[in-house]
UniProtKB/Swiss-Prot annotation:
Record-listed ATP binding positions: 321-323, 332-333, 447-448, 573
Biological source species: Mus musculus (Mouse)
SUPFAM superfamilies: Class II aaRS ABD-related (SSF52954), Class II aaRS and biotin synthetases (SSF55681), S15/NS1 RNA-binding domain (SSF47060)
Catalytic activities: tRNA(Gly) + glycine + ATP = glycyl-tRNA(Gly) + AMP + diphosphate; 2 ATP + H(+) = P(1),P(4)-bis(5'-adenosyl) tetraphosphate + diphosphate
Involvement in disorder: Mice (Nmf249) heterozygous for the P278YK variant are used a model for human Charcot-Marie-Tooth 2D (CMT2D), which is caused by dominant GARS mutations. They exhibit reduced amplitudes of muscle compound action potentials and a large reduction in sciatic nerve conduction velocity in the absence of demyelination or remyelination, resulting from an age-related decrease in the number of large myelinated motor and sensory axons. The loss of myelinated axons is length-dependent, and there is a length- and time-dependent decrease in motor innervation of distal versus proximal muscles.
Annotated residues for binding of glycine: 289, 340, 566-568
EC number of the protein: 6.1.1.14, 2.7.7.-
Alphabetized Pfam families for the sequence: HGTP_anticodon, tRNA-synt_2b, WHEP-TRS
Modification N6-acetyllysine occurs at: 194, 491
Domain WHEP-TRS: 53-109
The protein, known as: Glycine--tRNA ligase
Subunit relationships: Homodimer.
Length: 729
C-alpha cells in the first residue's frame, strides 16, 4: 500500500491541534487533503479505499467541531467563535467535495449529453436568445412546460388536497413598507464590484474566491502565501464591506474578463425595485418570496378556518431575485417558481395526528451533530428520529416525511436525497429546528426544499408595524381571572397638547406592558409627569393627560402567537434534479438517450404511433386519440415518416411513459388490438384497442403498475399479419 495515507494523517494531526487559535488552524491542511490524489484500489474494495482517504478529513472536521464547542463553553469572544465556525464550514466543504469526487463514475450524469438533449428537444432555453439572451432567465418549451406543470399538479394533489391546505394566490408586486418590516429591504443583499470601464458586475465574494484559487494553483505560490489565502477563503462568508475592499486591494483583484480595475464592493439589494402607479410616489418590489402574502392574510385565513389552530396555507407562484452572477442553469436564476406552505400551530401542541403514517419511513438524515463530528448522513427511521430528539417534534417530522414521499414520487432518487439539519449558527434566533432536503447532482449537493420550525416572527413584525393583532384565540378549559394594568389617556388633553402627533402618543400608550406602566405610575406620583419617545419624537405627559387604571378581568380565551412549520419548495431546482436523476443512455447504444420520468409527471403519458403512414391505420389513430382525451390522458400522435424504432427513440428522448402502436394485426384481426410499450423496459403487451385508454389512464394515475399490466395481458412477440416489420430497431 502506498505511504500517502499515513503521511496525510501525520500532516493533519500536526496542522490541526485541537485547541489552536482559529487563524492557525485555517483550511490549509484541509486544502492539501482535498488536492491529494485518490489511491488505486486494485487489491481492496473501492469503499474501503474511499473510507481510508476520507478518514483524515473526518478527523479534521471532528477536531474543529470540538474546538468550536470548547470556545462556546469557555464563553470566548464572538469574533473567535465566528472564525472557528467559518473554519468548520470550510472543512465540511472539503470533506463533501472529496466524498463527491470518490463516488462511482457510473453515478455521475453526463451533463453535456443531457444538456444537449434538453436544448435540442426544447425543454427550456435561455430567454431572449435571438437577442443574445439574458443570464438567469429561461423560457420553457412545450416539453419543459408540461413537465413543470405536472410537477406542480402532483404537489397540489400531494399537499393541498391531502392535507386540506388553504391555497391563496397573492400579487407579485409588494409595497416597500411590507418588505421593510420583514427585513428584506435592509438585509436581502450581497456585495458587488463593478468593472470601472465597461460596468460589468460581479459578486464580490465569488470573484475573490476564484481569484485566490487561481493564485494558489500557481506553482510559484509559496506555502506561507498559500496558507494565508486558505485562511481568507475559510472566513469568506464573514467579511464585511470594508474587509472585502481591503482584500481586493491586497490581492490586486481585477476583472476576470477584461483585466480592468474594479470598484470597491458595495451592498446590492437582490430585489427588483419598481414604482407602483404613475406618480412614482409608492416604491415597491417584485416579491423575493411567496410567504409574505400568506402572513399578511393570516387574519382572513384564520377566520376562514373558524378561528381554529392548527391550519395551513399555501401559495404557488413566481418570485424574483436580482442575482449578481446567476449560474448553474436552473439552480441559480433571477425568476423562479416557488411553492410554500405555512402550517400554523399552537406552540404548546406540536404533535401531529397523522405522524404514524410516515413514522416507518427510512431516509437519510444529516444531523447537526453528524456534521460537526465529520460523519456522513445515515439512514434512520423517522419515528426513531423524533423519539430520540434528532428531529424536534412530530409536526416537523410529519412534514419531512411528506416532503420525502413527494420528492421520490416525482422522480428524485432516494439514494441521492438527504435531509440536512441546520447547525446552531445557521438558524435565526427565533427558529427551533430547520432541515433542508438536498439532492446530489453533478453540481454537488444542492438545497431543493427548506423545512423550518420557527416562531412566527413575521406575524409579530407585521402586527407591530400595522397595529393589527395577528394572533389566534384559544378557548380555556376553565375561565381565569387576571389583573390588568393599563394607561387611561385623557384623549382631549393629549389632542390639545400634541394635535396631529396625538395618535402617535395614544398608540404608544396602548402598547406598553405592565412593568413599564408601573414605573411611569411611580414617576407620575412623585414628579407629576414622565416623558416618552416614539418614532424619533419626545412627548411629556402630565397627570391631567394620563392616569393608570387597574382592574380584574375574567378570560375565557387566551391569545396565542402561533409557531409555524414552513416547507419551502424551489420547483426549478426540483425539476433540474429530476432531469439529472432520470436521464439515461440505452445500454449498447450511446446515441439513444431517454428520461425515465414517473408517469405522474411525464410531459406526455402516452404516444400513439401508426406502424407506417398507411391510411388503413388512421381511423384507429383517431379513435385512440379521442378516447385518451376523454380519459384526461395527455398524449402525442407521431404519424411522421421513419421507422417505428426511430420514432420510439424520439418519444423516449422526451420521456413519454408509454406508447400505443397500431400495426397490421390491428387492421386485419378482430377484435381489434394494438400494442402498448413501456418506455423503461421497452417490453410490450397486446390488448384490445377499446381497453388501452383506460389502462394508460390507470398507469398514469398510479392505480396500477406495468407489472400488473404484464400479468393481465400477453406479451407482444411480433405481428402475425400484413407486412412484417421489426418493431424496435
Amino acid at each position: 500500500m502506498p505511504c500517502l495515507l499515513p503521511s496525510l494523517l501525520r500532516a493533519t494531526r500536526a496542522a490541526l491541534p485541537l485547541l489552536s487559535p482559529p487563524r492557525v488552524v485555517a483550511a490549509s491542511a484541509s486544502q492539501r487533503l482535498l488536492s491529494a490524489p485518490a489511491q488505486p484500489a486494485a487489491s481492496r474494495s473501492s469503499m474501503d479505499s474511499a473510507e481510508e482517504l476520507l478518514a483524515p478529513l473526518r478527523l479534521a472536521v471532528r477536531q474543529q467541531g470540538d474546538f468550536v464547542r470548547k470556545l462556546k463553553e469557555d464563553k470566548a469572544p464572538q469574533v473567535d467563535v465566528d472564525r472557528a465556525v467559518a473554519e468548520l464550514k470550510a472543512r465540511k466543504r472539503v470533506l463533501e467535495a472529496k466524498e463527491l469526487a470518490l463516488q462511482p463514475k457510473d453515478d455521475i450524469v453526463d451533463r453535456a449529453k443531457m444538456e444537449d438533449t434538453l436544448k435540442r428537444r426544447f425543454f427550456y432555453d435561455q430567454a431572449f436568445a435571438i437577442y443574445g439572451g439574458v443570464s438567469g432567465l429561461y423560457d420553457f418549451g412545450p416539453v419543459g412546460c408540461a413537465l413543470k406543470n405536472n410537477i406542480i399538479q402532483a404537489w397540489r394533489q400531494h399537499f393541498i388536497q391531502e392535507e386540506q391546505i388553504l391555497e391563496i394566490d397573492c400579487t407579485m408586486l409588494t409595497p416597500e413598507p411590507v418588505l421593510k418590516t420583514s427585513g428584506h429591504v435592509d438585509k436581502f443583499a450581497d456585495f458587488m464590484v463593478k468593472d470601472v470601464k465597461n460596468g460589468e458586475c460581479f459578486r464580490a465574494d465569488h470573484l475573490l474566491k476564484a481569484h485566490l484559487q487561481k493564485l494558489m494553483s500557481d506553482k510559484k505560490c509559496s506555502a506561507e502565501k498559500k496558507s494565508e489565502m486558505e485562511s481568507v477563503l475559510a472566513q469568506l462568508d464573514n467579511y464585511g464591506q470594508q474587509e472585502l475592499a481591503d482584500l481586493f486591494v491586497n490581492y490586486n483583484v481585477k476583472s476576470p474578463t477584461t483585466g480592468n480595475d474594479l470598484s470597491p464592493p458595495v451592498p446590492f439589494n437582490l430585489m427588483f425595485q419598481t414604482f407602483i402607479g404613475p406618480g412614482g410616489n409608492m416604491p415597491g418590489y417584485l416579491r423575493p418570496e411567496t410567504a409574505q402574502g400568506i402572513f399578511l392574510n393570516f387574519k382572513r385565513l384564520l377566520e376562514f378556518n373558524q378561528g381554529k389552530l392548527p391550519f395551513a396555507a399555501a401559495q404557488i407562484g413566481n418570485s424574483f431575485r436580482n442575482e449578481i452572477s446567476p449560474r448553474s442553469g436552473l439552480i441559480r436564476v433571477r425568476e423562479f417558481t416557488m411553492a410554500e406552505i405555512e402550517h400554523f400551530v399552537d406552540p404548546t401542541e406540536k404533535d401531529h395526528p397523522k405522524f404514524q403514517s410516515v413514522a416507518d419511513l427510512c431516509l437519510y438524515l444529516y444531523s447537526a451533530k453528524a456534521q460537526v463530528t465529520g460523519q456522513s448522513a445515515r439512514k434512520m427511521r423517522l419515528g426513531d428520529a423524533v423519539e430520540q430528539g434528532v428531529i424536534n417534534n412530530s409536526v416537523l417530522g410529519y412534514f419531512i416525511g411528506r416532503i420525502y414521499l413527494y420528492l421520490t414520487k416525482v422522480g428524485i432518487s432516494p439514494d441521492k436525497l438527504r435531509f440536512r439539519q441546520h447547525m446552531e449558527n445557521e438558524m435565526a434566533h427565533y427558529a427551533c429546528d430547520c432541515w433542508d432536503a438536498e439532492s446530489k447532482t453533478s453540481y454537488g449537493w444542492i438545497e431543493i426544499v427548506g423545512c423550518a420550525d420557527r416562531s412566527c416572527y413575521d406575524l409579530s413584525c407585521h402586527a407591530r408595524a400595522t397595529k393589527v393583532p395577528l394572533v389566534a384565540e384559544k378557548p380555556l378549559k376553565e375561565p381565569k381571572t387576571v389583573n390588568v394594568v393599563q394607561f387611561e389617556p385623557n384623549k382631549g388633553a393629549v389632542g390639545k397638547a400634541y394635535k396631529k402627533d396625538a395618535k402617535l402618543v395614544l398608540e404608544y400608550l396602548s402598547a406598553c406592558d405592565e412593568c413599564y406602566i408601573s414605573e411611569m405610575e411611580l414617576l407620575l406620583s412623585e414628579k407629576g409627569e414622565f416623558t416618552i419617545e416614539t418614532e424619533g419624537k419626545t412627548f411629556q405627559l402630565t397627570k391631567d393627560m394620563v392616569s393608570v387604571k387597574r382592574f380584574q378581568k375574567t378570560l375565557h380565551v387566551e391569545e396565542v402567537v402561533p409557531s409555524v412549520i414552513e416547507p419551502s419548495f424551489g420547483l426549478g431546482r426540483i425539476m433540474y434534479t429530476i432531469l439529472e436523476h432520470t436521464f439515461h443512455v440505452r445500454e449498447g447504444d450511446e446515441q439513444r438517450t431517454f428520461f425515465s420520468f414517473p408517469a405522474v409527471v411525464a410531459p406526455f403519458k402516452c404516444s400513439v404511433l401508426p406502424l407506417s403512414q398507411n391510411q388503413e391505420f388512421m381511423p384507429f389513430v383517431k379513435e385512440l386519440s379521442e378516447a385518451l382525451t376523454r380519459n384526461g390522458v395527455s398524449h402525442k400522435v407521431d404519424d411522421s415518416s421513419g421507422s417505428i424504432g426511430r420514432r420510439y427513440a424520439r418519444t423516449d428522448e422526451i420521456g413519454v411513459a408509454f406508447g400505443i402502436t397500431i400495426d397490421f394485426d390491428t387492421v386485419n384481426k378482430t377484435p381489434h388490438t394494438a400494442t402498448l410499450r413501456d418506455r423503461d423496459s421497452m417490453r410490450q403487451i397486446r390488448a384490445e384497442v377499446s381497453e388501452l385508454p383506460n389502462v394508460v389512464r390507470d398507469l398514469a394515475n398510479g392505480n396500477i403498475t406495468w407489472a400488473d399490466v404484464e400479468a393481465r395481458y400477453p406479451l407482444f412477440e411480433g405481428q402475425e399479419t400484413g407486412k412484417k416489420e421489426t418493431v424496435e430497431e
